[in-house]
Regions:
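Phosphate/anion-contacting hairpin/loop surfaces
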Residues: 156-158
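Short helix->loop/beta-hairpin flanking segments within DNA-binding domains
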Residues: 17-35
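HTH-adjacent hinge/linker in prokaryotic transcriptional regulators
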Residues: 2-19, 45-46, 56-139, 167-190, ...
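A short alpha-helical element within helix-turn-helix/winged-helix DNA-binding domains
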Residues: 29, 34-47
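C-terminal regulatory/effector modules of DNA-binding transcriptional regulators
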Residues: 134-135, 152, 161-262
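Helix-turn-helix DNA-binding motif, specifically the short coil turn and the N-cap/start of the second
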Residues: 50
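Short, acidic, Ser/Thr-enriched surface-loop or helix-capping motifs
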Residues: 39, 148-149, 236-237
Length: 262
């Protein structure tokens, strides 16, 4: 009896075989970041396939974020070494208490850039008020920004803090730094500590999903790339919430690492 090939029992489509070969060459380093990949004509000649098949093979790599098409020039390898995000270590007081930015834990030796920082007092969404235990109509200080590594956007973040945390101390150095573009050594958590609201406990919730159109533009995501949506609450030793941070990460740019004892 003849068996009709299916995705379960038949060979993979030719365009996927071509894509797999190119993928392996990118990951093995035979094509370095920025190298031009074989074009449609080269693939047609090498594999004896139609133009549509060659185009599909390149599209697979583009959709996976391993290649980028430059109009009028060709398709180029795009190999980004993922950031290793150390879940607990980056938030330890030992880190930000010593004056380090928590981002320094993630970005190894590559460093990072902060872009588009906007600081403003706003009336936030209802869920933000609820998490920060604020009454309806209350305002918060909102700090919105985007982070880049090697010139690539990898994350956007929006922090919310209650102005009550520095009420009566608006002219203090810590309060001024919280409202400034440069929050100083150790960042916001070090400034909260100086104001008597030391973060002692953090809660993070993470889920993977597909991005909104706005997120795709902001993070310059390739089609089909998921994001990691994170909600983090910082609390004092008395479990009083002092900051709520909403973070969107390029899912292809991160490895999440959690170290803990059994």
């Amino acid at each position: 009896m003849n068996v009709v090939p299916t995705s379960e029992n038949g060979p993979p489509p030719v365009y996927r075989e071509i894509a797999e070969e190119l993928r392996e060459r990118i990951r093995s380093g035979r094509y370095a970041d920025g190298d031009r990949l074989p074009g449609e004509n080269s693939l047609m000649e090498r594999y004896g396939v139609a133009r549509a098949t060659a185009r599909q093979a390149l599209s697979v790599l583009i959709n996976e974020g391993l290649a980028v098409a430059v109009r009028g020039s060709g398709v180029y390898a795009r190999l980004f070494r993922p950031l290793r995000r150390h879940g607990a270590r980056r938030l330890s007081k030992e880190s930000w208490g010593s004056g380090r930015a928590i981002w320094q834990t993630d970005s190894d030796t590559r460093g990072y850039e902060v872009e588009g920082l906007v600081i403003e007092e706003v009336t936030p969404a209802e869920h933000v008020l609820r998490i920060l235990e604020l009454p309806e109509g209350a305002t918060v200080l909102r700090r919105s920004r985007r982070y880049l590594v090697d010139g690539r956007p990898v994350q956007s973040a929006v922090s919310h803090l209650s102005p009550h945390l520095w009420e009566g101390r608006e002219d203090s150095e810590a309060a001024r730094r919280i409202r400034a573009h440069d929050s100083g050594p150790g960042g916001i958590y070090a400034r909260l500590t100086e104001l008597g609201h030391t973060p002692a406990h953090f809660t993070e919730e993470i889920r993977a999903r597909m991005p909104t159109p706005e997120e795709s533009v902001e993070l310059e995501l390739f089609p089909g790339t998921p994001v990691l949506e994170m909600a983090r609450t910082a609390l004092t030793g008395h479990h009083r919430p002092v900051e709520f941070n909403e973070i969107i990460m390029d899912g292809s740019a991160y490895v999440l690492q959690y170290d803990f004892d059994a």
